[in-house]
Amino acid sequence: MTEREKMLSGELYDSSDNELEQLRLHARKLARRYNLTDEDQQEVQTQILRELLPATEELPYLQAPVYFDYGCHTYFGKYSSANFNFTCLDVGEIHIGDNVMIGPNVTLATPMPVSYTHLRAHETAANLV
């Protein structure tokens, strides 16, 4: 089982795994690009969101700035939107339903820190629906 599979199933995993590091880096680069686009650059924003949120069919309206750990673990329903400073710590899957309006400065967080000292080198996560 890969570290990503462990992470998504809620098991202890190594967050320094190369695949996970590359996915996080990619998501942060895309979010940074999105945040730097002007609101009238809708085609560019759409292209970035398609890459950042590949599993979302109907893209939401996201008011920049936005932040994601992975992006590919976040799923938006139809006609959803999020105001500025929207943060998704999508270590586990995040499912946002249809017609959801998210206010400013909202964080959706799935990571669960491990409380035992000998396990703190690892993290776990739970899905958020």
Question: Language-model segments: which ranges?
Answer:
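Terminal amphipathic alpha-helical/low-complexity segments used for targeting or macromolecular assembly
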Residues: 1-59
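Short, intrinsically disordered/low-complexity patches at protein termini
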Residues: 32, 37-39, 85, 99-100, ...
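Conserved small/polar residues in nucleotide/adenosyl-binding loops
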Residues: 117-124
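Left-handed beta-helix
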Residues: 58, 63-64, 69-72, 77-78, ...
